Amino acid sequence: MNSAPAIQKLLDELERLPGVGPKSAQRMAYWILNTDRATALRLAQSIIEVKDTVHFCSRCFNYAEGDVCEICASTKRDGGIICVVSEPRDIPPIERTGVFGGVYHVLGGALSPLEGIGPDDLHVAELMARLGSEDVGEVVLATNPNVEGETTASYLARLIKPLGVKVTRLASGLPVGGDLEFADEVTLGRALEARREL
């Protein structure tokens, strides 16, 4: 796109978004240019509003507009079960299942010695404080099934188990509709280990 300076500035900013390359940025820029002014302003205002009003929940570190997030504030949630996730973006997929009725704790990342991320860089101390002050019977470790997530889950399990709190890990295995021939050995091994009686 042979761009005016304002268009080039928009393209440069759009390309900074995760997963957006030059072509996607160009499509978005064209859409913004071709849409009516009111729609473009609503988009801009939404971005400003979310940056001005959304912050971290003081209890679980999920996104919130008030002091605590809607999940922590709900009287319908079971505060005795805490699901530990790495990032706030991990909560919506779990919520969409409609299966989990407890509350969450967001670590703000995962342990990664290679990247210099240790326990003090995450919300581990805050989790331990919650376990000491709230009546929690179970902690579900829902970190990602990668090296960092497994390391984080193992570390947390070692910290939490001595408190007498039940520690569980999300089962990992084969996706529904998947074929065995395409499953990697680790996934298939975990599926076998987490098998259940019918």
Report the location of each language-model feature.
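Solvent-exposed alpha-helical segments within well-ordered globular domains of core cellular machineries
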Residues: 8-12, 26-30, 41, 45, ...
